[in-house]
């Protein structure tokens, strides 16, 4: 391992020890903000410090074991142990490289998840409902909490659009690569000829930003409309104008929220979603991504805009970004999607490592 990396790891280890001492001081314990910040930093360093300690132990173990090579009775055992330790060192170094990659500060935040039906009519709406159920089951398995902010139900079941907030540790980091076009191929229940139909939905995932990181929004840039909350088929579910629609005039971004009975609560939630969308758009613009960030995140709902295909006749799910196919569609639709999410995260980390190698 490079001397510069070892030096960085040593400084992180020292910082970890310093934080451990600070967290025991009464002045820090009595300052909630400071205690929370130090605790978070301490927890973030935990994995890299443990892995570095393991790496050090393995190197020391090799040095000690090499002393046994001159002993005929111990030589074979020593050679085997050295070989095993070298393999473990290689694994530890790979893990340390990943742990040292620049962290996306948004990864630890809650996330807004938006699912929108695209091409395919009623079947696209039904599939949007299936995706919502899939993500809800996944969230349940992670002990995350799902809060529906706005749901525009489809007459045949499912949703034209649904926006939810997923609360939990590291939600955005796990779900952010779900943004994009999701395509389904199956025979609809209403199809009498048994023909396979293709429909599409789009998914957008955005971090819920803390108040101090939210972009400033000029109230004069907003148009706020109120209306009555409605259920499926346009039926009114209450008699007051509690639902809120906010339009950000400069960007044209529109957010609706009708989950709460209180207009003030719906407005607060809608403003939070709006702030996240504006921040996401600005982040993408600064990164010189597509100018139309909302379109980039949500896609157009067109069949060609796809990251993943769910093929029911063949019982398979294919992620087109990394050419990954799994033949456990039923399990996936029941929320077992780690085997789809983790390979994407691993691929992203590999890309980051390659980029760092090129820079070095």
Swiss-Prot record:
Described purpose of this protein according to its UniProt entry: Peptide chain release factor 1 directs the termination of translation in response to the peptide chain termination codons UAG and UAA.
Protein name: Peptide chain release factor 1
Organism, as annotated: Histophilus somni (strain 2336)
Family: Belongs to the prokaryotic/mitochondrial release factor family.
Annotated stretches, region: Disordered: 286-311
Keywords: Cytoplasm, Methylation, Protein biosynthesis
Modifications made to the protein after synthesis: Methylated by PrmC. Methylation increases the termination efficiency of RF1.
GO annotations of cellular component type: cytoplasm
